[in-house]
Amino acid sequence: MKKIIICVILLAIMLLAACQVNNVRDTGGGSVSPSSIVTGVSMGSDGVGNP
């Protein structure tokens, strides 16, 4: 049972890492810090809030 839980956690970490790499590629050089997907969304909302 513990092995299954560990495998699920590892898969989740790998998926999150893959998403972060995709975000860096989309920005074209990592101008935006790839700390998490939420930062990109929050930065987008800030740009709309402050014209």
From Swiss-Prot:
Q: Which UniProt keywords apply?
A: Cell outer membrane, Lipoprotein, Membrane, Palmitate, Plasmid, Signal
- What is the protein's membrane topology class? Lipid-anchor
Which PROSITE patterns does this entry report, sorted A to Z?
PROKAR_LIPOPROTEIN
Principal subcellular localization: membrane
Q: Which residues form the signal peptide?
A: 1-18
- N-palmitoyl cysteine-type lipidated residues: 19
Q: What is this protein called?
A: Lysis protein for colicin A
- Gene name as annotated: cal
